[in-house]
């Protein structure tokens, strides 16, 4: 339960960052978040004209096979790294 509470707190805190992380950091965070919440990707890849949707899909797809616990822990670590880098 403590892991879930830490995850929820990290997800909340990362929304309060003073500066916007770069696209690579955001995609990494998104992929870990979706893997932690949903698990392996379960939607079709968006069309090639949906650049934002495709980038998000690819970020999530890269995390395929990662367990929920591992994705949750990795998300918390990445969020802490971004909080240290950008501040809240």
Curated annotation (Swiss-Prot):
A GO biological process held by the record: fatty acid metabolic process
A Gene Ontology molecular function term of the record: fatty-acyl-CoA binding
Entry superkingdom: Eukaryota
PANTHER family in the record: ACYL-COA-BINDING DOMAIN-CONTAINING PROTEIN 7, ACYL-COA-BINDING PROTEIN, ACBP
Pfam families referenced in this protein's UniProt entry, alphabetically: ACBP
Gene3D superfamilies (alphabetical): 1.20.80.10
Domain ACB, first and last residues per copy: 3-88
Record-stated family: Belongs to the ACBD7 family.
Phylogenetic classification of the source organism: Eukaryota, Metazoa, Chordata, Craniata, Vertebrata
Amino acids binding an acyl-CoA: 15, 30-34, 56, 75
Isomerase listed as a keyword: no
Swiss-Prot/TrEMBL keywords: Lipid-binding
Residues passing through the membrane, by range: none
Protein name stated in the entry: Acyl-CoA-binding domain-containing protein 7
InterPro entries the UniProt entry points to: Acyl-CoA-binding_protein (IPR000582), Acyl-CoA-binding_sf (IPR035984), FERM/acyl-CoA-bd_prot_sf (IPR014352)
Function text: Binds medium- and long-chain acyl-CoA esters.
């Amino acid at each position: 339960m403590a892991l879930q509470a830490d995850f929820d707190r990290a997800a909340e805190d990362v929304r309060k960052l003073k500066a916007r992380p770069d696209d690579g950091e955001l995609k990494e965070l998104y992929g870990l978040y979706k893997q932690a919440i949903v698990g392996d990707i379960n939607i079709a890849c968006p069309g090639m004209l949906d650049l934002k949707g495709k980038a998000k899909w690819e970020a999530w797809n890269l995390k395929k096979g990662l367990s929920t616990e591992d994705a949750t822990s990795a998300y918390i670590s990445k969020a802490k790294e971004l909080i240290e880098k950008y501040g809240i």
